[in-house]
Amino acid sequence: MIIRPSEPEVKIAVDRDPVKTSFEEWARPGHFSRTIAKGPDTTTWIWNLHADAHDFDSHTGDLEEISRKVFSAHFGQLSIIFLWLSGMYFHGARFSNYEAWLSDPTHIGPSAQVVWPIVGQEILNGDVGGGFRGIQITSGFFQIWRASGITSELQLYCTAIGALIFASLMLFAGWFHYHKAAPKLAWFQDVESMLNHHLAGLLGLGSLSWAGHQIHVSLPINQFLDAGVDPKEIPLPHEFILNRDLLAQLYPSFAEGATPFFTLNWSKYAEFLSFRGGLDPITGGLWLSDIAHHHLAIAILFLIAGHMYRTNWGIGHGLKDILEAHKGPFTGQGHKGLYEILTTSWHAQLSLNLAMLGSTTIVVAHHMYSMPPYPYLATDYGTQLSLFTHHMWIGGFLIVGAAAHAAIFMVRDYDPTTRYNDLLDRVLRHRDAIISHLNWVCIFLGFHSFGLYIHNDTMSALGRPQDMFSDTAIQLQPIFAQWIQNIHAGAPGVTAPGATTSTSLTWGGGELVAVGGKVALLPIPLGTADFLVHHIHAFTIHVTVLILLKGVLFARSSRLIPDKANLGFRFPCDGPGRGGTCQVSAWDHVFLGLFWMYNSISVVIFHFSWKMQSDVWGTISDQGIVTHITGGNFAQSSITINGWLRDFLWAQASQVIQSYGSSLSAYGLFFLGAHFVWAFSLMFLFSGRGYWQELIESIVWAHNKLKVAPATQPRALSIIQGRAVGVTHYLLGGIATTWAFFLARIIAVG
């Protein structure tokens, strides 16, 4: 750490009134580009307009102007998020059975949408219990509202109005910080200040205020709810905040105020800042007092972290110094130059952030079921399945986005003349070794993982079960995974002496938790079936990485096309006369990577859905006998490809296929429609541009004959446009098909 004398001069961080506010440009589509602004000659114009509208790099080369546009757009994005949240809360306030659900969450399903009977579609309003008819929702909003201490639909209504006010504030901020007081480039590049404010402000004070809300509002209200008090009789949130005696009745140590804090007698607060571990047996969720404790601890860590970086007072860490000192014995210049890259290329910055956020989102997906954070979430199987699936898809898309922006950085922002022997340069210089090894790994994993299934299918077909890989014949137990499970299950009292239970019941060792006769969570057994499918996961993930990483490492040049950087991020081929150079652009790698990301995530969510129905979710009788939804058939059925097709896809599709005439029939229609959207994509992916151009010419001829030809000349989609439309419909169709299949199934049986 270097300590320099503080600099007294005042820095001016904004420009006043840099851009006049005017609506004239709104009337000129494509005002950001000279070519597009001329208006359409051919139908390609509308595609270029959409492709380039948000590509700020192509509007100007001025980094300050680009930064301001991105910054302003972020406020617009936040405004949309607040608007969306407001809509969710408004539905809860106006169209939901939230108050009824609150009084009996085990027998009443959450619903916040009632279909109007216009053409007879009121059939979709199923009976969710308690005499309420509506569409069952699986977003988890009811559970999070209960955890926050919301007890009435009026409170939801007020929150919805509050979110609308914030949405308009964000819109105003977006306009203000572009037209009235726009930050200078130096402000965007002041990473130490940004770190301090984001760490201490957003994460530190954000967590602290949430911890405060949980202690003063959520905990007491949930205490009353758990005890069966009618929500209408529970004091309102502000009463707990203003009247300490109310809290002291529930938590006696509240009467002592801040004295235990200053006398370091902190254990007095253990009533509401607990360290219990495990799940609350009443709600099947994590203990809310544990969650409050967690947020308080996190807040303190981030508040400290937000004071570590050097800004005005010449004390603290400088990011540039940290990065440049980061050298290993075998890494040449190490991270030298990374600081310059990350403060001048927003694509490089975004790429890192997307990779981190995508990975975090996938980690969240796995924690939502193994450590269910909200009351009555674990027994709402539809919501559990939806939350896992949703976070897996989002994580997958974010990680592909990370590769996309890394490649854009390589093409547009990377300057090879200034980079020598730093980590990035060294990776680029041995990219052939990286990609060829990765390729070998993919071939190995593909043949071996798939080979195990093919072996099992063959033995099963020949009637030789004793020669199959299974828990009852040739065992391939996942011993490393079981070892990790055992370490965690045995941690309390050994490696974590302060803990009373392990972090998650899924590790094993504990008793199952059931709420209202339904299983919330139990130790998850792993066997040969999991070993097989985990190697399919390894295979699909490595292929996705191979495609995406090859796109990044060969974005600027390759043996095939040494001057690739000059062709840009997306191009169809290296010009006429160079055969075999199509589909090599960085964009095409993102395109291909999306398909393999879709493969990867599909296998994960199928594995999760079947495993949970087979080994976790189910009912428990008065005698303590657990009956799982599919009766534990995962271990013996999922070890063949035929088993996946027969006992998972086909057997569990019966609910969506037979949904017509019931309240689930919308899922049946979606299942059909989404298959159609998916099939529609193949038309774009399997045919060439010339085919369509020929067809268009004869259609134009017919229009000319009838004198109804348009002034704008119709053109076939370019190769890139066709692939973009194709992959979009492929993913949209595939994801919506899966959604309909999952939800119809789990709402019917869960």
Swiss-Prot record:
Membrane-topology annotation of the record: Multi-pass membrane protein
Entry's cofactor comment: P700 is a chlorophyll a/chlorophyll a' dimer, A0 is one or more chlorophyll a, A1 is one or both phylloquinones and FX is a shared 4Fe-4S iron-sulfur center.
Gene3D superfamilies on file: Photosystem I PsaA/PsaB (1.20.1130.10)
PROSITE patterns: PHOTOSYSTEM_I_PSAAB
Segments passing through the bilayer: 70-93, 156-179, 195-219, 291-309, 346-369, 385-411, 433-455, 531-549, 589-610, 664-686, 724-744
Keywords, comma-separated and alphabetical: 4Fe-4S, Chlorophyll, Chloroplast, Chromophore, Electron transport, Iron, Iron-sulfur, Magnesium, Membrane, Metal-binding, Oxidoreductase, Photosynthesis, Photosystem I, Plastid, Thylakoid, Transmembrane, Transmembrane helix, Transport
EC number in record: 1.97.1.12
Residues involved in chlorophyll a' binding: 675
InterPro entries linked: PSI_PsaA, PSI_PsaA/B, PSI_PsaA/B_CS, PSI_PsaA/B_sf
Recorded superkingdom: Eukaryota
One Gene Ontology cellular component annotation held by this UniProt entry: photosystem I
GO molecular function, one term: oxidoreductase activity
Principal cellular location given in the protein's record: plastid
Subcellular localization(s) per the UniProt record: Plastid, Chloroplast thylakoid membrane
Residues annotated for phylloquinone binding in this entry: 692
Chain sites annotated for binding [4Fe-4S] cluster: 573, 582
GO BP term, example: photosynthesis
Classification via SUPFAM superfamilies: Photosystem I subunits PsaA/PsaB (SSF81558)
Catalyzed chemical reaction(s): reduced [plastocyanin] + hnu + oxidized [2Fe-2S]-[ferredoxin] = oxidized [plastocyanin] + reduced [2Fe-2S]-[ferredoxin]
Binding site for chlorophyll a: 683, 691
Family: Belongs to the PsaA/PsaB family.
Reported function: PsaA and PsaB bind P700, the primary electron donor of photosystem I (PSI), as well as the electron acceptors A0, A1 and FX. PSI is a plastocyanin-ferredoxin oxidoreductase, converting photonic excitation into a charge separation, which transfers an electron from the donor P700 chlorophyll pair to the spectroscopically characterized acceptors A0, A1, FX, FA and FB in turn. Oxidized P700 is reduced on the lumenal side of the thylakoid membrane by plastocyanin.
Complex and partners: The PsaA/B heterodimer binds the P700 chlorophyll special pair and subsequent electron acceptors. PSI consists of a core antenna complex that captures photons, and an electron transfer chain that converts photonic excitation into a charge separation. The eukaryotic PSI reaction center is composed of at least 11 subunits.
Name of this protein: Photosystem I P700 chlorophyll a apoprotein A1
Species of origin: Sorghum bicolor (Sorghum)
Gene field: psaA
